[in-house]
Amino acid sequence: MNKRKHMDIRRLIISLPAIMALWGGLASCDKMIYDNYDDCPRGVYVNFYSQTECAENPSYPAEVARLNVYAFDKDGILRSANVFEDVQLSAAKEWLIPLEKDGLYTIFAWGNIDDHYNIGEIKIGETTKQQVLMRLKQDGKWATNIDGTTLWYATSPVVELKNMEDGADQYIHTRANLREYTNRVTVSVDSLPHPENYEIKLASSNGSYRFDGTVAKADSTYYPGETKVVGDSTCRAFFTTLKLESGHENTLSVTHKPTGREIFRTDLVGAILSSQYAQNINLRCINDFDIRLVAHHCNCPDDTYVVVQIWINGWLIHSYEIEL
């Protein structure tokens, strides 16, 4: 009896290396197990980080909690679509994007797409990277309120899955830089005798995005932002917007409510870029804008006020001469 037990244990010990070798072969697509590599699972591991041109080191934003990740081939056709929940970015963490075939791929990723957005139809093997991925929800001309949320976008360098028959790796690794696609904009108007009579608005045609992070053509949409009186001669409004960039009608306006007359209207991004101090306000590095407009009484037909100075993040970017 004991002799048989010893024999069974010995057989088990002898067979363990064989079992481990078999498991390792299955896990790594060993040629000893597979006749070829056609059924071998493959893919790209992606590490996500965030770093602007102005930052010395990468960061790993804690507010990124969800990732929608897409892989497109060299022809711009979608080959893999994945959603990862409860994300926690770190230098060591990677996410696997499964792929079936050898070839060149680019990874596009969006962080924090939620129920504020409508997602377009997605079909593996048909959808192109130039198609619209999502649209910010809106009611008429007003966008849904995205205060307290952030949106992020990343793209990887082109990566290549090579033929494993030639000794290539089963999986490859890359990184993708998440850039924030939301802005927080505080606008104050000073030197108004009756600040309760004025309304601040901010609109942009940036509510739709393609898979590749570019803005799709859309009508201008107003972002919610209540104008409040914050002093004897000051009113203020706060807005959370999607990415403000040149060419998309980023219109900031101030209206005198009793008459309906606009006392100020400008393309916000255009005003920044046309300023001699534009180099101090790098739109690639800044997501928070503190805008101060200084008003002055003018010799106008309706005896009202106009804006004579524009300050952004402490910089006087424009001043205007008026007839007093």
From Swiss-Prot:
Which taxonomic lineage is given here? Bacteria, Pseudomonadati, Bacteroidota, Bacteroidia, Bacteroidales
Query: How is this chain modified after translation?
Result: Palmitoylated. Palmitoylation is important for export to the outer membrane.
What more is known? The name (minor fimbrium subunit) does not indicate the abundance of the protein, but is derived from the greater length of the major fimbriae. In strain ATCC 33277 and strain ATCC BAA-1703 / FDC 381, major fimbriae are 300 - 1600 nM in length and about 5 nm in diameter. In contrast, minor fimbriae are only about 80 - 120 nm long. This length difference is observed only in a small number of strains, including strain ATCC 33277 and strain ATCC BAA-1703 / FDC 381, and is due to a loss of function mutation in FimB, a protein that restricts fimbrial length in other strains.
Lipid addition (N-palmitoyl cysteine) is recorded at: 29
Q: Give UniProt keywords alphabetically.
A: Cell outer membrane, Lipoprotein, Membrane, Palmitate, Signal, Virulence
Q: Under which name does UniProt file this protein?
A: Minor fimbrium anchoring subunit Mfa2
Q: Which gene encodes it?
A: mfa2
**Impact when changing residue 29 to A:** Loss of palmitoylation. Abolishes export to the outer membrane
Q: Which GO terms describe its cellular component?
A: cell outer membrane
The UniProt family comment states: Belongs to the bacteroidetes fimbrillin superfamily. FimB/Mfa2 family.
- What is the purpose of this protein? Anchoring subunit of the minor fimbriae. Regulates fimbrial length. These filamentous pili are attached to the cell surface; they mediate biofilm formation, adhesion onto host cells and onto other bacteria that are part of the oral microbiome. Fimbriae of P.gingivalis are major virulence factors.
Instruction: Give the matching Pfam families.
Output: Mfa2
Q: What happens when the gene is disrupted?
A: Minor fimbriae are longer than normal and are easily detached from the cell by mild shear stress.
Principal localisation: membrane
